[in-house]
Amino acid sequence: MEQSSTKQTINIDDGDPPLIRKGMHSCMSQRSPETSVPKRARASSANSRWGRSTKFRKTYFPDATKEMWNDWHWQVSHRITTLAQISRFLTLTTEERQALEQTEGSFPFSVTPYYLSLIDPTDQASALRKSVVPSILELFTSPGESEDPLHEENTSPVPGIVHRYPDRALFLTTSFCSVYCRYCTRSRLVGGHTEPLETHWKNAIEYIRNTPAIRDVVISGGDPLTLSDEKIEWLLKEITSIKHVEMVRIGTKVPMVLPQRITANLLRILKRYKPIYLSVHCTHPDEITAESSKACNSLADAGVVMGSQTVLLKGVNDSVETLMELYHRLLKVRIKPYYLFQCDPITGSEHFRTTVDEGKELIRGLRGFTSGYAVPQYVIDTPGGGGKVPI
């Protein structure tokens, strides 16, 4: 989820710095008009997503009413977590079966029925499938990879707090996510058993209270929006009662994987403590559905300020067409494209990582071809705990 940054500048300039623009103009002049503008993702693929979850529910969960399907508790309690379960829904390859068997004891597999409804059941190469279904390549460790590449443990003064930057603190409130991303930076932490939340939280909040330099608290995990309304309100009340805390952010993927969680009561809670800033983890245009759009627009109506975080993933979203479609759709649901992250060197993630030069080329393919609001900042979270570096 979210890591606080040394730089918070959002580029809303439609152009490029003169030197970059000059080089880009030279490059563009060599292209025909037909190839100057990147081709948009086909509308048909986007339109096919609307209503998919309803068809999926009726096919695979015929006893589930519409009300049950739209209850986030039902979605969480019916998560698909085993090889036997996922085999009912997807035509698995031999490699996928082996991966599910061999990764079971290390990094859990979990996907909500809703999110599974967005995944192609037969195409192993489909983007969302790659992002959540284990790969046999996870079992191989490449040079430079580690379980804690950002050295968060080294900057954790008390359990649950990462205090890397002077005025910002990361508060890891839970190890639970409704859907586990296979490239997760905190795969070492998520999915396991933790100490009682009350003890964990009270010690963390006491640290924030006793550290006046902290003005910005990032609530993360796991996914904090999978907590109950009561726990979320308790956290927000405690944190916002600290006088030197000026800003509260929440890092989450819930609007994309569990949009049913954005209930009227949760919106009332968030509105009560506004402004709340939401860093929404978005991976691919296929996540922007009728359900996720409704959730995001409801959050915006409640006064929640939203920016996106996208991890650049080989074979998932590493094309100008895919990123442009994603960012245009995010803007339509009032999420500002904020960060595009180079994939962290987490153990077993080499198959997801592009080169930095490839990432820079993607940004060049966006800048100048679409509005500045649709161009995120490309950053590397430097290994060893050095913080974010814009590219």
Tell where the protein language model's regions lie, with residue ranges.
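Short acidic, glycine/serine/threonine-rich loops at helix termini
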Residues: 183-185, 230-231, 262, 391
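Flexible, acidic/Gly-rich N-terminal and inter-domain linker regions that tether
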Residues: 2-163
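Conserved AdoMet/S-adenosylmethionine-binding subsite of the radical SAM
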Residues: 202-216, 225-370
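C-terminal accessory regions of radical SAM enzymes
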Residues: 361-391
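Canonical Radical SAM [4Fe-4S] cluster-binding loop centered on the CxxxCxxC motif
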Residues: 163-198, 250
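Short, charged beta->alpha transition segments
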Residues: 156-159, 169-172, 203-207
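Hydrophobic positions in the central parallel beta-sheet of the AAA+
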Residues: 171, 217-219
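Fold-independent oxyanion-binding glycine-rich loops
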Residues: 174-175, 187, 221-222, 253, ...
